[in-house]
């Protein structure tokens, strides 16, 4: 008997008519086929509203019908689950000679794409012999492995059911079939419908109007169903206007239509939202949702429809969670996206797959590890501070710092049975999180329990697979866990706004709907093709009835968008991102323009609402939450302080407003009594500290007093300088003994270079930081290039002074007794520091100080004074007053670049100090005058520090572009 087709536009009453006929046939045990499992309960409620009790019939998905037919035949095989099927494909790929595909097969996405392609081929009822090349070989190997294990996958079950229905009279007993919500039928589904229509009454509902561009993607399905119906076609007229607002009914008829329709008044039934960024768009939607909920609109009657739930999941959770909007996402969630699953997968990745330090601490930081959060922070901070990265070193050092082992790591690494290890770990994780005194209650706890149950089911599936197929590796278990999804969440929970994608929205009904993603690139979506089956191959296989060709992405999204616009009965909101988060403009989707074109321009403008990137707060009246009202109050305080104060007093927000407005004031002078007491008691100052204060007192306050530190160790200029100084110290202290000289010359240059190589190796071994091989090589080669050049330049130097003293500390307890008092600055203040090197006249008590610089630049005599560089002038006073040598000058020695030494030299000693820049030699009066001014500058700077005199005073009057401290000192930046 032929199939019956019910066709018509959206909301023409097709499904209602189908449900009525289903109820009329209850005495014949009818079967109603719906698209998704989540639709079963939704349709059940619709039927219960029509008839209080249903005493017959069933509501199934296509999979349910296929299973019923296949398993009733008696020859059915066990069906592999998704996880087992993925493991089977991994096994096939491991054994197959991939030839040209070997490079691609290394990546996990290769197996996933092959799985999808094999599913399409089986759904198209194709055999390996109908294909060619590597795909045919892989398909044949896959089928052979299934046969060897005496298993079916889901698609083979479908194929078997379709074949049984075509050949076995007992496969179906005359129950009428009703189906809706299927626009793209696979080969197996089409074979089932064909076979059923030959044996019983089959009624199919299809949204379709011939000739309308909105239904172009359904043309093939409609034509095939019409041919199968053989004239039994009911075309229903448009009826959306009977239940929906006039503007919505007008949109249904005019959207993507070739003929021109007279515009009707919008009257608020269609509204347009534009905002900057995904977060801004969702906050605009959230504000409107709150307003609707507060007016009494039931949350379950509102739907948020988006092209992809996955892409918007994170900003959606942030925006809706901040505003306190109850919502439910209709769709699958990967196990690794749940807190419980993320902790577990991270732990397995670290223990079994050589994961990173971050993977281990993702687990340890979770409530499921059983380790105190404070202890985790301490251990991770120390490991990051030493850049410990390799898994073994992370465990070794982490357990040493923690004082006890991490049991999960050892148990997983030593486990003989990966499944039992995961089962024990998950049970312990749940106990750690909840124990006996904190039973799992609340939404978060329910999610943890759902995840735990899903894991147990998966482990049971994997155990069955191991019994069938043999060994199961740790990699297999970890891969299965990462791919596992939780059972789909319902998006129609009472009291919650439903969040659905375009595909799931087809069978839903709302009073109010928000359609998101109406910017170019989001809708229509870019098409994707399989690397295994291109369009030409699909076209050729379709000639054999495989039904592998899919409509192009534009026509498909056009239909889905048309359907989404017909979901609401009262109001439709269209939402687009007018700009990115960084302000770059985004073009609207063509679908956005199509909707606006069916209404009057002025009407569209009236019902368009925009939120610009600069709109950091809502208006005070429209702020949806107290937090946003407080932010709006702070903005009001900038323009109307009196009004803001009055509002704050009326609502008890005075302290909050004061705290917010004080953030705009930038006082710098230190006033706290304890801080001033600490600074006032300070009598000794390091020379580099004074130089930093001279550069900018605010920068000094942040760097030297607050002293924030980066938690992650890096191979930076500071580390390079430390290693270079250490290597130079070792070199010059060992030179007299190992080279037999006090001064280098060209005759021993090669021996000196070899000694420097040994000293650098020792200095590198002393680095208390775990570096990667690349980092270690880069540091070694960069320093070796510079230090070798320094040694060779020393060998070529005409300087007759001999390097005698190195790393001379003064002004501290670790200094020599005669140097501990430091350099007297006057007013009871003294200077501390460390001189890198002193070169001495072998025939007299004279010398020069040398200060190594790891960079390329050295300060000239003029720059020393103009830029307030104090080291060389003050070090020369230390040389004279504490060391007891007459200073001939001081030099900065850059270790990189041209390595040209610059500094402050006495012109009277030009014969002794040859070869330096002419401008660095000063006459006696100028030389000692500059030195004395440096001492006075140091005294003044030290005095300012003691009184807490911190201001915004960057050298030159403007903050340098490279300074990154402005976020703390709060200096406005362009």
Regions found by a protein language model. Give the residues of each.
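Metal-dependent nuclease catalytic regions and adjoining charged, substrate-binding loops involved
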Residues: 578, 601-605, 743, 878-973
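Non-catalytic protein-protein interaction segments used by genome-maintenance enzymes to assemble
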Residues: 807-882
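Adenylate-forming
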Residues: 164, 707, 793, 820-824, ...
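Metal-dependent nuclease catalytic cores in nucleic-acid-processing enzymes
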Residues: 505, 552-572, 862-896, 945
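Short beta-strand or tight-loop elements
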Residues: 268, 300, 493-498, 560, ...
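Polyanion-engaging groove/track-forming segments
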Residues: 1-742, 757-767, 774, 778-789, ...
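Short, contiguous acidic/charged loop-to-helix segments that flank catalytic cores in large enzymes
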Residues: 446, 465-468, 487-490, 547-553, ...
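Short, charged/polar surface micro-motifs in flexible loops or helix N-caps
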Residues: 40, 519-523, 813, 854-858, ...
